[in-house]
Amino acid sequence: MINESVSKREGFHESISRETSASNALGLYNKFNDERNPRYRTMIAELHEFFHLTLAETITETDVKELECNKEKAAKFRKLMPKMLNNCRELTQRKSYIPYNSEFNGNDEKQKKFQLLHQHQIVLSFQEFCDELAKLIIDAHVLSFLTRCDYSYEIIPKNWTSFYKLFQYVMGAVGPIISYVPVNYPMIRKELGFETLTIFQYYDSKLFECMKSHFGREFSTLVSATIHHYIHMFPITNTMLEKEVPMLRIMSNCNFSIEGLSPKDFYMKTLRQYYCEESNLRPRLETFKNFKVLLTRNALLASLFSPEWVSDANDLFISHLLLNKKSISEYIEIGKDTYDEEKERYFKTETHFSLLMFRNAFEAKNMLSKFKEFCDDAVSEKLKAAYGSNHDTERLFDEVVQLANVDHLKIYSDSIEYHLCNLLGSTSKAIEQYVKYFESHLFIIVRKIKTTKKDLPRDMKIKYLNENLPILRLKFVNLPTFPNFFERSIFRKTILQSDQNSSFIKDILPVYKDSLMELFKQRIITNVSQEDEMRYRDQYQPYLSQFFQPVEVMADLRIKYASFLSFYENIEAAVKFGKTYNENNSKSFFPLIFDRERIPKVFQQSNEVKKNFVLPQEMDDTWNQFLRNYHEQNKVEDSDASKKELYPMWNLHHCEVESPYIIQDGTNLIFELTLFQTCVLTLFNESDHLTLQVISEQTKLAYKDLALVLKSFCNYKILTRDIDNTYSINESFKPDMKKVKNGKLRVVLPRTASLQSSNTGGERTSSAHHEGSNSQWTQELLKACITRSVKSERNGLDYDHLFETVKQQIKGFSVGEFKDALAKLLRDKFITRDESTATYKY
């Protein structure tokens, strides 16, 4: 018998002893009629006392190392263990009887009958007895641990590992006893609950059942707290992996469920909630830059609980940060915000993170189509938001340029171009709006250089200009006709703003060429250095080809850009001539003489236009004086110009007329008019009221031209008209100051009509050009429609279906024009023809 005085905290364990007595009654000797066998009763009591001793010697300990170093206690347990194992053997191998029937003898007394109990039942009952004693030890240790930690979700995780190691020591002390039956009677392991668990895993589950009974519904909160304890622990090291024994790892080993979930599923659920709530794991610049570090840490954290969870945990992390449209959209926004600071092109900003990593993540999950869809949706949403209900093209192109700058590898550039053209109606309209946007920014940058950076050296000014130009990197910049849009704009501005004081002539025109070449060279010369190409070849190989154009396209582009330079030189020469004449001869006249071949076709006239209308006397004298001076000068000098004839382009003549209206700065408002408008308006210097017939007789203008001019003045309320077709100066005229720029108001001819004259001397073309009727313009529209139609069909279109699709979009073209446009697109490799299916594809 073990001396009961061994316990130093007898008072603490009295309740345990009293509870155990009931267990004894259920255990072996009252149940199996062992009252008459004191030997078995003694063995049962000795086992009970051994468990009692184990509890007494360990309940006050908090550091298992002290127990392991206490040789006296270890010797005590070792000394008693052989006897305890012998008791186990005796109690499981004994014979026991139970009454099964009673009979009356002749004296009316009951006679008991007994039946030998099967050993299987004896063994099971002994294991129940051991489980009951083990449960009492577990309950006592759990209660002591939770009491010390004050049931705190913060303190328990910090002390869990030390408690569990103490628990392992205690269960190891009684291990030979509680494992006696499973080890020696393997045939009944299944009935005991040890089919899939080891004996210690079984008692680990009993440990968690006990803790669950203390926390009830809040048990899952405790488990979450232990997970978050490790999540917020920095850094996670291999040493930690060796020393820590997380609660969830033990639960996983013993298949203990939480809220009906397996430990792994519960961990993934907790991790998912953490990702959503943790601000440091939202799409941010630092998060993307440290992506690999965070992913490695995520893997180490999962391996702390189970190495088998690493793959799923990393998939969850990647899914949260990469595999969704929101993250792609946020990454693009981050790129827009940081591009101005980094000022790097293509690969330079890809060292930390890039959209390619998103793409690779989607591709690894066989979700590449989803990636393209998400990119397309993100681009579409951003462009629509920028364009808005008020159709703000300035904001739209701000967004387009920023999106293109982020997309260094041109992963979603096709989406940008598609949605841009879709919002603006067509490719040609998108290019037209971009030209306006480019020129607007060029004006702003030049003005800023003049005001805030005027002291910089010239090369620094040029560098600043080039760095801040809104360069657009989309495929339509490759169109051979792309420079033509700029040519038309430059030509038009040169005509409208040709005077000595014009900011366009003084400041913009001198830098326009270099600025455009900075834009154009993006299509001719790649910014990828050989060093970068070699460095990133493996990772970026699929995209390198996007930076280079086919040889045929390159040759065509160079020809077009050479043609642009020639056009630009002609503009410069014309402006130089006009400046010289303006300074030396007439301050009010600025002549521009162009080579006919260099004038954009939409502005050209087929034949010479004779002056079959009447100019105001002063203007007529100035014009005739110019002709005399020009011919006389060229005749004397025997220049090349003497061999050429002058063809006046009356429809393009531009006049500035000073009005009597005073604006806010105290100066007279200046009207910007066409020559024909000027001829009409100057008549009102002599009379305030003129009839249509009188105006027609004095100007000799054709009725269509005259009607359009008068309508333009009425639209701006400069003139009024009565029921007798009499036109008068509007005495109460007030200009719309929103339309006044630099003290000038341009009176625009109505767009709804065409200025044409059928005078006998020739044909005159209006300055309100309807470019869609021009053959060259029709070609561009056809090419844009063909490209868009083919692009929208994944499987391509055959010739007939393609023709019908384009025919639904634009009208008024011939089959020959359609075939020419199709042939040019095939030549320039904007589309291809699949010979096997006879279809055209993008």
Swiss-Prot record:
Disruption phenotype: Delays anaphase progression.
Region of interest (Required for interaction with MMS1), ranges: 1-50
Sites of the Glycyl lysine isopeptide (Lys-Gly) (interchain with G-Cter in NEDD8) crosslink: 791
Matches recorded under Gene3D superfamilies: Cullin, Chain C, Domain 2
Subcellular location: Cytoplasm; Nucleus
GO MF annotation list: ubiquitin protein ligase binding; ubiquitin-protein transferase activity
Coiled coil region boundaries: none
Recorded GO CC terms: Cul3-RING ubiquitin ligase complex; Cul8-RING ubiquitin ligase complex; cytoplasm; nucleus
GO biological process: cell division; DNA repair; heterochromatin formation; nonfunctional rRNA decay; nucleosome assembly; protein ubiquitination; regulation of DNA replication; regulation of mitotic nuclear division
Key words of the record: Cell cycle, Cell division, Cytoplasm, DNA damage, DNA repair, Isopeptide bond, Nucleus, Ubl conjugation, Ubl conjugation pathway
Post-translational modification: Neddylated. HRT1-binding is necessary for RUB1/NEDD8 modification of RTT101. The modification enhances ubiquitin-ligase activity.
Role, per record: Core component of multiple cullin-RING-based E3 ubiquitin-protein ligase complexes (CRLs), which mediate the ubiquitination of target proteins. As a scaffold protein may contribute to catalysis through positioning of the substrate and the ubiquitin-conjugating enzyme. The CRL associates with CDC34 as the E2 ubiquitin-conjugating enzyme. The functional specificity of the CRL depends on the type of the associated substrate receptor protein.
Family to which this protein belongs: Belongs to the cullin family.
Name assigned to this protein: Cullin-8
Lineage: Eukaryota, Fungi, Dikarya, Ascomycota, Saccharomycotina
